[in-house]
């Protein structure tokens, strides 16, 4: 990884499911997050003012986990395509190399569409580490993306390229450490079923307008880092590239 990628949240293959403390069924009340939808169910034309571009339809990444990690991925459901092949979705937000992605339409537009979809209700909170209610964002994501675009989605698929992490507190985005003394609080969730969003703003993060883009999603023990700066082509503060 690049020298700037100091945060060890970037290490691949780190995801924790603790069945005793965080049962995988904990997503049952969080917008029907696990599993797939019929790829043709509920699809409708998306044209005219206020509609999202249908070119986003195939912003997908098809990767299958290694056998040694298969037990960690038993909540990822395979969606059957018309050709009978099964897709594994572990990322829906990334600009990837051609061999790693299937992208129809503009990558920037599609990526930013999803990123805004997930974070728009949060972006006005730019001071400290906030605990933000995710119900609106998650339900909106499920409705617009799953039902209208017909994408296979499970809670946590917006995480970065399968780089799973077992951090349950907000981290300092440039050093991978807890917030310094005197900084904003980083409370743990008490009720995992509430599906909260821990959002850390880091003044040291110059990309994306000074926004630290790490997050922790608590449901079924899923934790993740949204970004992969190693192939971020446009660190220009507008959420394009690598997000």
From Swiss-Prot:
It comes from the Eukaryota. It is found in: Secreted; Nematocyst; Target cell membrane. Its main location: secreted. GO terms for molecular function: toxin activity. Contains disulfide bonds. One of its GO terms (biological process) is monoatomic ion transport. Nematocytes. GO terms for cellular component: extracellular region; membrane; nematocyst; other organism cell membrane. Residues 1-48 are annotated as: Disordered. Keywords: Cytolysis, Disulfide bond, Hemolysis, Ion transport, Membrane, Nematocyst, Secreted, Target cell membrane, Target membrane, Toxin, Transmembrane, Transport. Residues 1-25 have a biased composition (Basic and acidic residues). Belongs to the jellyfish toxin family. Has potent hemolytic activity. Is lethal to crayfish. Causes cutaneous inflammation in humans. May act as a pore-forming toxin, disrupting normal transmembrane ion concentration gradients in susceptible cells. This is Toxin CcTX-1. It comes from Cyanea capillata.
